[in-house]
Amino acid sequence: MTSRFSLLFSLFCALCFAFSACEREDNPHILWGNGTPPALPTPQPQPSPQPSPNNPSPNPALPLNAQQRADAARLEMPQLTGENGELFIVHRVANPQGRDSIVNYAYAYLPQSYHSRWVAFRFDAQTRSKVVGRKPYDAKPQYPRDPKLPTAWAIPSDLPFGRVYDHGHLVASADRLFSREANDQTFYMGNMSPQLSSFNQKYWTGLESLVQDLGRNRSFADTLYVVKGGTLAPLSSFGYAANGKMPVPHHYFMALLKVKNGVYSSIGFWVEHKNYGKIGVPREMGKHAVSISALEKLTGINFFHNLPDAVERRVEQTLTLSSWSL
């Protein structure tokens, strides 16, 4: 009797263990290299949509230090949200005059997408000059891991995007030619987006050339503020690159704000990511133009929010193509 009871008890324990083993799921981790990534940064609450121009904090809930808060208050910076573990990354370069370092460009990075939400920079007296050329093609790595991103949430150096996608610069190499360091920083993987080769090398360059020509034209603008990016929402992207980690945007956008003699004006561009079968011509880019107000609705991004509210409303609702050589 005792042996029969022991046998039944053993069978019961074995079944319980089997069921518990079947119900347990491993928590998958994305591994770059040999380490296990840390938890995503804790999402922060949504900020108020219109910060006071007298206190242009991007989001008081974001854990920004004093320097980051100052950088986030620059006119080119869209509003930070703190959602989905958003990271605010700023790349600076040495000032050839030996003064404070120069902000080269910045971006809001979404770790779960391994892609930036937007990149932002400006053409001004310090950054519009053309002193150097493109980073040499034989330089290795050609596309380094961004050293400012946590290793676990950064795309590794030179990771291929697949046969049909290029490493598409968001801040173009030709946007940053004022120093060797500034140009080299545009090749960081954090500045890359998977773009169709025909789009990256032909059509998109038409819009990039327009922006570069305007940004370097002192008679056009004292400062040209630029924001670029691609759509990342699941319904706004098609497929993934970088070993299935990085969404391929369905659209790319640009938001431009210029100031000349204290007068502001703006324009947005909304461009479908596809093979256009031709080289983009700068003067034809007007077909993709939209107001900043419309672009904000398309992207969910609050552009140029550091302007005084009255100026922001006027500038973002007005679109005059002739003011942009279109």
Give the role of each language-model region:
Residues 1-9:
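Bacterial N-terminal signal peptides that target proteins for export
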Residues 9-18:
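Bacterial N-terminal signal peptides
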Residues 22-326:
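Domain-level detector for secreted/extracellular nuclease and nuclease-toxin modules, and
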